[in-house]
């Protein structure tokens, strides 16, 4: 399989996971997460400098997610790095879940910022 097909397949998996998370939670909207799947896959695969085994490395690049409703996209790509399990993705938007509807900072798991309402983040 060539790199282009592999990248497309990975993005498709992010889309499937995002839609599944929202469907299982019966809450949220997957459009943004599905639309951003290719972008976030390329960003994490090709451009971000980070080490999933050393999440507090000072030289790492940081990915800040402003629109928290796109969290299924973030959790999915972080699951590919081993930071979340499929069982944790299934708990999306549940009380006490490690995958809340709007991410809460947890650097050890790859979430660099708490996101809230649109427009409250970085531009």
Where are these regions (language model features)?
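N-terminal capping segment at the start of a domain
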Residues: 11-27
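Basic/polar N-terminal segments that are highly enriched at the extreme N-terminus
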Residues: 1-8
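Cofactor-binding active-site loop characterized by glycine-rich and histidine/acidic residues
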Residues: 21, 36-123
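Flexible, glycine/charged-enriched surface loops at secondary-structure junctions
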Residues: 30
């Amino acid at each position: 399989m060539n790199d282009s097909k592999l990248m497309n397949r990975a993005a498709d998996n992010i889309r499937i996971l995002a839609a599944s998370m929202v469907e299982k939670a019966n809450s949220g909207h997957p459009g943004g997460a599905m639309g951003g799947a290719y972008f976030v896959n390329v960003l994490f695969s090709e451009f971000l400098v980070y080490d999933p085994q050393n999440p507090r490395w000072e030289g790492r690049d940081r990915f800040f997610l402003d629109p928290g409703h796109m969290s299924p996209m973030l959790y999915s790509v972080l699951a590919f790095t081993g930071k979340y399990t499929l069982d944790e993705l299934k708990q999306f938007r549940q009380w006490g879940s490690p995958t809340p509807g709007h991410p809460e900072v947890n650097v050890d798991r790859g979430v660099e910022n708490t996101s809230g309402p649109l427009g409250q983040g970085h531009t």
